[in-house]
């Protein structure tokens, strides 16, 4: 599986690869400079509150035919970033909001909310 990993430098520069973002819990915790238990807790809360669907945001990846691990999508990484309070998560949130604001050179952001009981979610 070709997967991209987000990096955040010490001075807050965010780099998102061109490959689809799929990151392990350890990679997410390294990017946001938190302990792995904080990432696990955030993921559990996001799934428990049905903010995101596990089927859409998590994949099982097998490496070298033996080691299996879970990876999470960009959507999950963004959701986690909004639950943390670190310098890196703030830099990432600012990066995401700047990208949303700069779409088509406009400063307006339109958010559409689905009020469905089965899969509540937000789309931009």
Each language-model region and where it sits:
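N-terminal start-of-chain detector that recognizes signal peptides
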Residues: 30-33, 50-54
């Amino acid at each position: 599986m070709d997967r991209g990993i987000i990096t955040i430098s010490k001075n807050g520069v965010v780099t998102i690869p061109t490959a689809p973002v799929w990151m392990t819990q350890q990679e997410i915790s390294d990017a946001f400079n938190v302990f792995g238990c904080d990432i696990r807790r955030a993921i559990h809360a996001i799934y428990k509150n049905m903010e995101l669907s596990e089927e859409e945001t998590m994949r099982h990846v097998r490496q070298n035919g033996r080691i299996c691990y879970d990876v999470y999508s960009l959507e999950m990484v963004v959701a986690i970033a909004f639950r943390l309070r670190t310098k890196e998560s703030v830099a990432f949130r600012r990066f995401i909001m700047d990208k949303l604001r700069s779409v088509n050179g406009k400063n307006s952001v339109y958010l559409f909310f689905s009020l469905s009981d089965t899969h509540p979610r937000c789309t931009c």
